[in-house]
């Protein structure tokens, strides 16, 4: 499997669909979740909160995988059956996107731990560039998964971003209200 999602996303997502591995994608997501929990442990959070952060990262990946799978079924021009291999491919593509999240966390570690006054500003600029690159790779991943034109992929990309944001916002509200109880 090719992990070069940064410079060759089309080939990476294509090979991820051909050689889909749910375990590899889950390992990437778990590493990302553990790294995020490590960052929050530096703030003095308790172990329960750190475990919830790892679970939250896994939930984000799972929601994105389910949405990619659903949009693949809805917007592909062919009649498809609900096949487990298709979900594995969508989950693998979402796992490949999580390499960007790992890169974001490394940038936060590098620029967030420096004492220079200009380093956080440079870090914010780098985070913005990485965020835009991740959105572009999400579009490319959708285009590869759907095997469609740019117009259809752009529509699915917009719908995916909106629905993904709404679902995660609702899940965050429910989770925070459960914690407050």
Question: What is each stretch, according to the model?
Answer:
Residues 166-181:
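Juxtamembrane boundary at the C-terminal end of a transmembrane helix
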Residues 48-73, 94, 98-164:
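Selective recognition of hydrophobic, aromatic-rich stretches within alpha-helical transmembrane segments
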Residues 43, 157-159, 171:
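Residue-level detector of alpha-helical segments with a strong bias toward transmembrane helices
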Residues 1-93, 98:
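Selected alpha-helical membrane-embedding segments in polytopic membrane proteins
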Residues 38-46, 107-115, 174-176:
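Juxtamembrane "helix-exit" motif on the non-cytosolic side of transmembrane helices
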